[in-house]
Design a protein with these regions (language model features):
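N-terminal auxiliary segments of SAM/dcSAM-dependent transferases
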Residues: 1-20
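C-terminal alpha-helical "lid/dimerization" subdomain adjacent to the S-adenosyl-L-methionine
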Residues: 17-18, 88, 161, 165-216, ...
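Conserved alpha-helix/loop element of class I SAM-dependent methyltransferases that forms part
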Residues: 29-32, 38-59, 74
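Hydrophobic beta-strand segment of the Class I
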Residues: 30, 129-130
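A short glycine-rich, Lys/Arg-flanked "PGG" loop and its adjoining helix->strand segment in the class I
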Residues: 142-157
């Protein structure tokens, strides 16, 4: 389902290449725009992930679709000794590397270019794996999740933060109006890539959230699966283990 929506409808490139191009294009103002369009709530959601993982005391964490490194940097507070932030977009990673350096976290966090559907790591490599606002951008969702399951250690924790669609009135109607009209308009004003924020809202609307995503995780082989709706259902935090 998530494969049907691509950033650039006129492009002949595959979804993966288009997503890489899109995030390279918007990397310069991505952080600021995220704070604006989410009213700062994305920061609170990430703090919940950090609090959850801190209780698990992982030594190693892989943050997939790390972007500019917000979650990877925040997870330094978990006490993890080794955090790898992986992303398709060199442009996003360049911003992230500067943020890591500004926090003096170069010895803890490594930022690497990589593909979530072909992870450059051995089996059972990480105590925890996270993806924030990234799984809906996978070209092949199940293949990406299979790779995550492969490199996660037995007993390790997998945490996903992803947008979802509210089901209750009036939040459902308000969400549709905001994502269809307001979010793309904000993107048009502040981003040089007019298609990017339209894609981000469209991809969120078709992503298999809630129980549908739980079922996919179960199919892949994850256990202990839970999803926790956030802020009236506009996002969800999914937790699972191997």
């Amino acid at each position: 389902m998530s494969e049907k929506v691509k950033p650039y409808k006129e492009s002949e490139l595959g979804k993966k290449e288009q997503v890489k191009q899109m995030f390279d294009n918007i990397s310069g103002n991505y952080d600021g725009l995220n704070r604006v369009i989410s009213f700062g709530t994305d920061v609170k959601w990430r703090k919940k992930i950090v609090a959850f993982l801190k209780e698990k005391s992982p030594d190693s964490i892989l943050d997939i679709a790390t972007g500019t490194g917000d979650l990877a940097i925040a997870m330094a507070n978990t006490g993890a000794k080794n955090i790898v932030g992986l992303d398709l977009s060199p442009g996003m990673l360049e911003v992230g590397k500067k943020k890591v350096a500004n926090k003096n976290l170069q010895n803890t966090i490594e930022m690497v270019v990589g593909d979530s559907e072909n992870l450059p790591f051995e089996d059972n490599s990480f105590d925890a794996i996270t993806v924030a606002f990234g799984v809906r951008n996978f070209e092949n969702l199940e293949k990406g999740l299979e790779e995550i399951h492969r490199v996660l250690r037995p007993g390790g924790n997998f945490v996903v933060l992803e947008t979802s669609v509210p089901t209750r009135t009036p939040f459902k109607q308000g969400y549709k109006i905001y994502t269809k009209y307001v979010l793309p308009s904000i993107g048009n004003l502040f981003s040089k890539d007019r298609s990017a924020y339209k894609y981000l809202s469209e991809s969120a609307s078709v992503f298999p959230h809630g129980q549908a995503f739980n079922n996919i995780l179960k199919k892949i082989g994850f256990i202990g699966i839970e999803n926790k709706p956030q802020t009236m259902g506009v996002a969800s935090i999914y937790v699972a283990s191997k």
